[in-house]
Amino acid sequence: MSNQYEVLGKAPVAGDLKKLTSSDIHLTIKNLNAGYGKMEILHNFDLFVSKAQSLCLIGPNGAGKSTILHSIYGFTNIFSGKIEINGKEITNLTPAEKLKSVGIAYILQDNSVFPDMTVEENLLMGGFIKDKSEESFAEAEKVLQKYERLRNRRGQPAKVLSGGERRLLEISRALVMKPSVLLVDEPSIGLEPKYIDMVFEILRDLQQNE
């Protein structure tokens, strides 16, 4: 089906998108029109994503991939349409409210580690939405035990990490946070192959933990 739409140059309709998901739909976007300022970039956009499903947005620069992520998280103006998590409408919630109430986390394309905080402290920042700090410490320890590169520098400031190690740290925070929806913009950009493998291993771990 994907090849058919690629050849014809047509976008799939909502009914066809639903066929690609299970009956357990977690994220729903219906007839979304969104953009920046007064400029509308997304037009009547639909999306359905099941629980524990991984979805990759592919397209040329300027196609609107980041705008879709920004709209889900709350960085754009929503002109019409709605976004739901498990049937709960979250269209007009702020990013902080989406993180707290329904567990939407966003890993930006640009580096977002805290350079003067230690590697371990950066990991623990991923658990600030949890009620029990003990659980956050336990999850952070699991990450450190699994990834030697982070474990060996757990007490050092994050600014000493290489670009690949910083990206690994950013995405590892999601293992501590345990979001219901994780948005990742360009997860492997600028990374060496060894780090790309680690990043996608983390994303697989998150998917299997659902």
Cite the ranges covered by each PLM segment.
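ABC-type ATPase nucleotide-binding domains, specifically the catalytic core motifs of the NBD
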Residues: 37, 55, 117-138, 146-148
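The feature captures the beta-strand-to-loop junction immediately N-terminal to the Walker
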Residues: 58-60
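ABC ATPase NBD coupling module
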Residues: 77, 89-105, 110, 133-134, ...
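Conserved ABC transporter NBD signature motif
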Residues: 81-90, 100-101, 135-140, 145
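Conserved ABC ATPase signature
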Residues: 157-161
